[in-house]
């Protein structure tokens, strides 16, 4: 049997960028009558609210100066766990979805890649002397777009990213424009 692992890779990448967002994307798009486990955990209002609260909390906490690096062993492991879980939940919603072990492996591996890519992006911006917050907002926008694509809601993702993009692009333009005396 063939499995389309593209969406599993995307939801894993999202979890590497923002650990809670992959699970939240799956939760918020799970139908109320879903009975397949583990997606059924998100079929009720409390599952959706809990996942959304975790994602919003992380989007805010990521910008705080005392937030630890995602590259700590605990940070990488938790992102891989969230990526694996999000991929398993996503696959469980589909009649011909990948088996749980395959979905977990794909989601966790993609999450590791997303973790490293996000850290590289933020470090590159910092090394260029740019403030962190515009890079963080652009990373948020990329994660939201990938999340929407992973769960099959590309129009909603585009609208969310457009709003975030307008804010981030204005901030980024100001942060990237040369200041006096800075070549």
Language-model segments: residues:
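Short amphipathic, positively biased membrane-proximal segments
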Residues: 1-183
């Amino acid at each position: 049997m063939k499995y389309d692992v593209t969406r599993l890779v995307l939801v894993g990448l999202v979890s590497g960028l923002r650990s809670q967002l992959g699970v939240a994307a799956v939760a918020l798009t799970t139908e109320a009558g879903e009975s397949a486990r583990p997606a059924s955990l998100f079929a009720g209002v409390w599952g959706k609210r809990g996942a959304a609260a975790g994602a919003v909390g992380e989007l805010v906490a990521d910008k705080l100066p005392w937030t630890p690096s995602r590259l700590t062993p605990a940070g990488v492991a938790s992102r891989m766990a969230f990526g694996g879980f999000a991929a398993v939940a996503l696959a469980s919603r589909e009649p011909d979805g990948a088996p749980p072990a395959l979905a977990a492996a794909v989601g966790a591996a993609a999450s590791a890649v997303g973790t490293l890519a996000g850290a590289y992006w933020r470090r590159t911006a910092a090394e260029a002397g740019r403030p962190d917050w515009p890079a963080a907002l652009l990373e948020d926008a990329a994660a939201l777009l990938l999340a929407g694509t992973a769960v099959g809601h590309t129009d909603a993702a585009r609208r969310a990213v457009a709003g975030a993009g307008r804010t981030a692009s204005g901030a980024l333009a100001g942060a990237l424009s040369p200041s006096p005396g800075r070549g």
